[in-house]
Amino acid sequence: MFAVIRTGGKQYRVVPDAVLKVEKLEAEAGSTVTFTDVLAIGGEQGVTLGKPVVEGATVTATVIAQDKLDTVIIFKKRRRQNSRRKNGHRQPVTVLRVSGINAA
């Protein structure tokens, strides 16, 4: 069984016991998060698409950790001007383990 959820402006295809990194959520490590924006659910019976969401469907996940992605380097240079700027950015993410998909 799989589901497609929407969180943080992105869509993720999830299966039970999958580990995924999503945009930062305000949740402590070890807590449970429930997603109600389920866009599609699939299994042996076929695929159910939502319009725009599947009514009554939820996906529950456990927060493993709050983390940051690798550094993305931003380097700007103006030629012949001895002008350069180097900056870095680390995007905060939440690491989740999907514990269950409820099709209801």
Swiss-Prot record:
Pfam (any one): Ribosomal_L21p
Transmembrane segments: none
UniProt GO molecular function: rRNA binding; structural constituent of ribosome
One GO BP: translation
Gene Ontology cellular-component terms listed: cytoplasm; ribonucleoprotein complex; ribosome
Keywords recorded for this protein, A-Z: Ribonucleoprotein, Ribosomal protein, RNA-binding, rRNA-binding
InterPro entries with a match to the protein in the record: bL21-like, bL21-like_sf, Ribosomal_bL21
The UniProt record lists the keyword Ribonucleoprotein: yes
Superkingdom of origin organism: Bacteria
Family: Belongs to the bacterial ribosomal protein bL21 family.
Subunit structure and binding partners: Part of the 50S ribosomal subunit. Contacts protein L20.
General function of this protein: This protein binds to 23S rRNA in the presence of protein L20.
NCBIfam families: L21
Protein's name according to its UniProt entry: Large ribosomal subunit protein bL21
